[in-house]
Amino acid sequence: MDRIVEIEKYSLDETYETSLRPSNFDGYIGQESIKKNLNIFITAAKKRNECLDHILFSGPAGLGKTTLANIISYEMDANIKTTAAPMIEKSGDLAAILTNLSEGDILFIDEIHRLSPAIEEVLYPAMEDYRLDIIIGSGPAAQTIKIDLPKFTLIGATTRAGMLSNPLRDRFGMQFRLEFYKDSELALILQKAALKLNKTCEEKAALEIAKRSRSTPRIALRLLKRVRDFADVNDEEIITEKRANEALNSLGVNELGFDAMDLRYLELLTAAKQKPIGLASIAAALSEDENTIEDVIEPYLLANGYIERTAKGRIASTKSYSALKLNYEKTLFEE
């Protein structure tokens, strides 16, 4: 069963989410420092009539890395071609993408940390020298053919910057980490998005949805879509706090933004009574993939102090006990 607070992209939601994305920096809310610096770099590159240097965006899923890539394309008046690292299985796949680029194009690679070392080797000269080295044959008879590429900007996005090899990371001239959003920022995003959906969202309703969105715009917009359904069924043009609460409670998203999976995760850790639990054990207990736990469930819990990650495993913090209305002292020391 799909989680309403799932952060990964749903293919059916892509058209919906794209229609709500801002097209320029003026409409982009949050990440102020990143916006300010990008504006400067874009303006400078346009004055010099040059491509932007390569850019790496990192941070938890759903914070706007893809949106920023598209805004950069708009601000640079450049074409953008989008792909994801898992789709680039062979060096020939990457070569086909690179040779189809035009001067000044932007290539956006999502989940760039999942590129294989062999693919990275092809990417290095393309990023540094705008050159593609193709090896024909094998052994002593192997030959390298060098193909010049048009100047382009590579924008990479990753939820796991630590998994990037140092040579690849060092080839990005600009590196930015996106941070979780404040509730007030999410509320503004929601009110703007509601207008695009032909609804008016009251400020208190927007804040209520924001509070349950795990500080993540993608989740906030998905919840807004579901709350809108409740409003439509009741023939309401205005999304009220009461209707938002009703919808979110019905969806099983509590006041902290936790759903059933989050609660199962925290209950597992608190039941361990401060004994660390390894990732593999958690994945087995929850019947979830380890990557899903690390990329989807844990980032928000870690950032907000609900769990601690140690060398031996995960431990629930006192904040988790409070969230589950458990007595920390009793749970910690009872036999």
Curated annotation (Swiss-Prot):
It comes from Campylobacter jejuni subsp. doylei (strain ATCC BAA-1458 / RM4099 / 269.97). This is Holliday junction branch migration complex subunit RuvB. One of its GO terms (cellular component) is cytoplasm. Residues 255-335 are annotated as: Head domain (RuvB-H). Mg(2+) binds at residue 66. The RuvA-RuvB-RuvC complex processes Holliday junction (HJ) DNA during genetic recombination and DNA repair, while the RuvA-RuvB complex plays an important role in the rescue of blocked DNA replication forks via replication fork reversal (RFR). RuvA specifically binds to HJ cruciform DNA, conferring on it an open structure. The RuvB hexamer acts as an ATP-dependent pump, pulling dsDNA into and through the RuvAB complex. RuvB forms 2 homohexamers on either side of HJ DNA bound by 1 or 2 RuvA tetramers; 4 subunits per hexamer contact DNA at a time. DNA binds at residues 309, 314. Keywords: ATP-binding, Cytoplasm, DNA damage, DNA recombination, DNA repair, DNA-binding, Hydrolase, Nucleotide-binding. Has 3 domains, the large (RuvB-L) and small ATPase (RuvB-S) domains and the C-terminal head (RuvB-H) domain. The head domain binds DNA, while the ATPase domains jointly bind ATP, ADP or are empty depending on the state of the subunit in the translocation cycle. During a single DNA translocation step the structure of each domain remains the same, but their relative positions change. InterPro entries: AAA+_ATPase, AAA_lid_4, DNA_helicase_Holl-junc_RuvB, P-loop_NTPase, RuvB-like_N, RuvB_C, WH-like_DNA-bd_sf, WH_DNA-bd_sf.
